[in-house]
Amino acid sequence: VGSMQRFGVPMGFGGPHAAFFACSERYKRLIPGRIVGQTVSKNGEKSLRLALQTREQHIRREKATSNICTAQSLLAIISSFYAIYHGSFGLTQIAKRIVNLRINLESCLSELGFDISDGSRFDSIDVYSEYSEKIHDEALKNGFNLRILPLGSTPEDSTGFGLSLDELSDEKEIHKIITFIANVIGKKEDLKPICLDKEDFFIKNIPLRNDPWMQQDIFKNYQSETDLMRYIFRLAEKDFSLVDGMIPLGSCTMKLNSAAELSPVSWANLSSIHPFAPSNQTKGYVQIIS
């Protein structure tokens, strides 16, 4: 089981996000909803069909699992098109860049005297320091929320801080973080310029998969903005929506989600709040939820 949040969906104060999951053959009939499979039509053409259905309409009611499905289609569509647009090569480059940023951040922190623990990790660093409280205070002044360690503690009684990077992080952001940390511990003169090697990514402590993945045609054919836009429009033309007519009552796969409900997903001033953000930064979200 995993979250698709990193595939083009903002944090949104912790959700909602689409998920992906896999299971062994023995559990496949317990999967909720419908599974679409690829087959060949009688004319020899590639086609898609419903391969497995677990709804009350199709199997005995006591074995149905559709009652635990949720309406996450918009989030799943966003993540799917993010993967389609970037393909396996693009996603690999994004991941390698994040790892490279993380390695540079670790290197800078080590040069400032911080002890960075060994271990396999992707985008996050945990650092324990006697300067933890002061670093948290300085981070807030510079517009950053650092993860408070141990989890559940306050900046005042914390013993460490954590940093996580993503595809929006860059060298300028890392330099800003390192600068205010160096100021706190009195080592500003030890700062060195951050310069990423764009050609040869130094990946360490992460076991990389070498087998091919996302090799289906769908992840290779729509990697320009124009191609993707035309593909989305062709799919939309096949759909039945309010553009075509009223959605019939009782159709559980076609419930109305109004545009006003869906569009805030892309609002930068609403959708980018981290679920661990301090309560004094999330008053608007608390009001919406309550």
Identify the residue ranges that each predicted region occupies.
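Short Gly/Ser/Thr- and Asp/Glu-enriched loop/turn motifs at secondary-structure junctions
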Residues: S117-S124, I148-F161
